Curated annotation (Swiss-Prot):
One of its GO terms (molecular function) is zinc ion binding. GO terms for biological process: response to stress. Zn(2+) binds at residues 64, 68. Its cofactor is Zn(2+). Belongs to the SprT family. Keywords: Cytoplasm, Metal-binding, Zinc. It is found in: Cytoplasm. This is Protein SprT-like.
Length: 145
């Protein structure tokens, strides 16, 4: 999919205004669906949103970013809290918030061999060096959660 052409198409169909800048995929975006850059007018989009939720949700995110874009160039309130932004977003059926992507960080679960306590950690624990904080028993790697 040529992203810039798709954004131009959505802009004309849903807003009736032309998109004159570039749109890019940005793999570094984690918690947001897209970003508008007023300095040079380009838009960034999160490819994981498109891959995870499909074209219908992605189109609503494109509408959200285009609402920022068009309001900025019309000299109106383009920020999330501005009335102009909220009204335009409602008119074009854009998403107010990006759907959350699942947190890809998993936990390691350690089990105390003495008291059975479960301890969750993101990083590995040196089992030769560390013990249970409750009973000082030995730990063993139980599972990845």
């Amino acid at each position: 999919m040529n992203l810039t052409n798709y954004v131009k198409q959505v802009s004309v169909e849903d807003f009736g205004w032309e998109f004159r800048h570039q749109a890019y995929w940005n793999k570094r975006l984690r918690t947001t669906g897209g970003r508008f850059f007023p300095k040079d007018g380009h838009l960034d989009f999160n490819p994981k949103i498109y891959e995870t939720f499909g074209l219908e949700i992605f189109r609503k995110i494109v509408r959200h970013e285009l609402a920022h874009y068009h309001l900025y160039y019309q000299g109106k309130g383009y920020r999330h809290g501005d009335r102009d932004f909220k009204e335009l977003l409602k008119q074009v059926d854009g998403l107010r918030y990006a759907p959350s992507l699942s947190n890809s960080q998993s936990f390691l679960v350690y089990e105390c061999l003495s008291c059975g306590a479960l301890i969750r950690r993101r990083r590995r624990v040196n089992l030769q060096k560390y013990r249970c904080g409750r009973c000082m028993g030995k730990l063993r790697l139980s599972e990845k959660a």
